[in-house]
A protein has these predicted regions:
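A short glycine-enriched loop-to-beta-strand structural element that forms part of the catalytic core
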Residues: 81-97
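Alpha-helix N-cap/helix-initiation motif
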Residues: 19, 78-80, 102
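Catalytic NTP-binding/metal-coordinating core of nucleotidyl cyclase/transferase enzymes
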Residues: 1-65, 69-72
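Active-site phosphate-binding and catalytic loops of NTP-dependent enzymes
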Residues: 70-81
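Catalytic-core segments of nucleotide cyclases and related cyclic-nucleotide turnover enzymes
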Residues: 96-104
Length: 104
């Protein structure tokens, strides 16, 4: 599973404090859902999360639960405080590599 906040890069340029606040809320919502569905967060890149799961049902359940939780959260907030994410799903073998240690 890959997640990414919509508009986060622009927001960090416009209002860094708000961007960091929303990122913390984002993490408070998403992390427990991934954990509940036996997922593992294997990488973070700013506002993006890469998580792995052993079963396809766990991936789908997590994606639906995350979008539902964010929708409920966003109803209570103004447009400028909305957290909107994109989620990409893939099922199959995953190869993770630490590119920091690769010499070019």
């Amino acid at each position: 599973m890959f997640t990414d906040m919509v508009g986060y890069s622009k927001l960090t340029g416009d209002d860094q404090n708000l961007a960091l606040e929303l990122l913390k809320e984002h993490d408070k919502i998403i992390e427990p859902i991934i954990n509940k569905n036996q997922g593992a967060i294997v990488k973070r890149i700013g506002d993006a999360i890469v998580a792995t799961f052993s079963q396809s049902e766990q991936i789908i359940d997590s994606a639906v639960e995350i979008q539902t939780a964010l929708k409920k959260r966003n109803i209570r907030n103004t447009k400028s405080r909305q957290i909107v994410i994109r989620i990409g799903l893939h099922y199959g073998d995953v190869v993770l590599k630490n590119l920091k240690n690769v010499k070019s």
